[in-house]
């Protein structure tokens, strides 16, 4: 009988097999890409190697001698991973110890132990559970240094301080420029604990390099292959594969022995985003993009960049069982956080603000819906609709938001207010300054430098400011607010439910002593009704993957994906125009 053959080409297994074997192969590997009759391609992952090895026991397939050792190495890697995952569920399992200045909690040791055994792990523990400390545990294991920590711009100093607390013997360095330089340069640094300036000379490669996502692309050639471990903090930043930071992250991750991603919200919008986050965490473990789309998203998916996972709970379960993701809730880690109450409160919106942009937005909406102009012009029109309608809605609500927050402050609350447009911050701030008893506030938005943001945080935490006005997308990773505030107000809405959860997580986290209130102040006009509807659809994707065993873990809804088209339709309908469905 003719035997088939397995070889490797471009990081993929190429399997040539006779017809009767091909039929069975397709049944087992439904996502295999078919080149021609009897020839298939699969991502060369340990899991696929393990399955192919099992398949070879039953069907005639020879292995190219040139890849025999590589194939066996991949099979063994998967068997070690399965054993490590199984061990965690065994009675009497005790995770390894980690020598830190502040002893880690057991659940942190469990995740760190699993990451070291598997080589790639997404830690999606609930917000405020100490994921950074979990990552720092791994720094003390043999063969892990040097480490690269990639985080958001405003969190680089916070990471340096955390490492100094937990592992003070490690030498850390925050990249200070987007232009690569030698680590042996003479420079002035500020001690993260004492705040004193000092002139130092690095002794070559530091133990831990801390970089923000914006600088990563410039440093990829200097860091790829030079660091053994990479930590992607707030890994939802890597959810889009067409960005420079994603490409740089993937290039560095592929050269590392250990990859750990940290985020409680790996999905902001659509299920396809989990593939990109997992590709930098455990490259190829979810197969190729085509395999993932075919097997997890189904045929009726529309735009691949907005593809929804057909059964989010099933994918979430698989990620856990395969040792690719670990997530613990407050109950799992036995750290009770006070109750969270979410209130959707309708407020008045100044219709005059919406009327100012109504005519222009209607023209743009018709251009989008009727496909007038080039694709670029329609894309620009869609962006302009989004910007103008959300801004006008935010401005129209600003007065009502300020009045609402003033009542909270007068009742003794210190309030964290989330918005998006600078005009909205300005109007709310001006209202605070006009009101009889002025309300001191601090700004933590996209305009402030990291130092200014740190000062704003200090003023709020120390009580100099009663309100912290913060950007919807600037708060990820920010810690310390939970000790002084229990009240969150959304002055504006984001299109992504993950953004809202990140915002709420600034106060609803470990260390919070009181029940938390989160107020969504929404208008019945403008962009709020459409955004609210879209948020429900997207949350179905995130919730199922994040918590597949939750009683309300939903199956993806079948509603349309094009949020701007829906906003455009709403604009025209409210002005009495006929819109074809």
Placement of each model-derived feature along the sequence:
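Charged, low-complexity
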Residues: 13-121, 165, 170, 191, ...
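Conserved P-loop NTPase motor "coupling/switch" region that bridges the ATPase
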Residues: 144-147, 165, 169-172, 180, ...
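Conserved Walker A/P-loop ATP-binding site and its immediately adjacent core
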Residues: 134, 144-165, 268-273, 420-422
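Walker A/P-loop
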Residues: 118-138
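Conserved helicase ATPase core of P-loop NTP-dependent helicases/translocases
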Residues: 182-184, 416-418, 426, 433, ...
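A conserved SF2-helicase RecA2
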Residues: 495-580
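SF2 helicase motor core recognition
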Residues: 216-221, 267-271, 425-429, 453-457, ...
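Interdomain linker/hinge connecting the two RecA-like lobes of the SF2 helicase core
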Residues: 119-122, 235, 241-242, 270-271, ...
